[in-house]
Amino acid sequence: MVALESAHLVGAGGALGALCRHYLAGAIQRETFPLGTLTVNAFGSFALGLLTFAGVTGDAALLVGVGACGSFTTFSSFSVETVRLWENGYVALAALNAVGNLACALVGIGLAWGIVRIV
């Protein structure tokens, strides 16, 4: 029964995170550069960092961390968008997207870590 309850929490959080990603990324996505994906990955990393470094565990970690943050961020879309940029001859933008996603995610995690340490 515990596994089923955990699955429900992850699923509910996942539905919420996916919907938020869809609308937020869609609202700020650009034709020439996948700004929407970069933004959700950075923000999602920050949010997951806050949860993790604040010591959130149990049901809240399943709902928000695994479910919502896990589905809000998207490594697969980032990867496909990077390859598409490369395929279309935008090699510099592909490199910028690859480096930018990693850098922004790490900055988000770092900011979260710093905030939790201060508070």
From Swiss-Prot:
The keyword Ion transport applies. It catalyses: fluoride(in) = fluoride(out). Pfam families: CRCB. Na(+) is not transported, but it plays an essential structural role and its presence is essential for fluoride channel function. Keywords: Cell membrane, Ion channel, Ion transport, Membrane, Metal-binding, Sodium, Transmembrane, Transmembrane helix, Transport. It is a multi-pass membrane protein. The keyword Metal-binding applies. The chain crosses the membrane at residues 46-66, 96-116. It comes from the Archaea. One of its GO terms (molecular function) is metal ion binding. One of its GO terms (cellular component) is plasma membrane. Na(+) binds at residues 70, 73. GO terms for biological process: cellular detoxification of fluoride. It is found in: Cell membrane. Fluoride-specific ion channel. Important for reducing fluoride concentration in the cell, thus reducing its toxicity. Belongs to the fluoride channel Fluc/FEX (TC 1.A.43) family. PANTHER family: FLUORIDE EXPORT PROTEIN 1-RELATED. This is Fluoride-specific ion channel FluC 2.
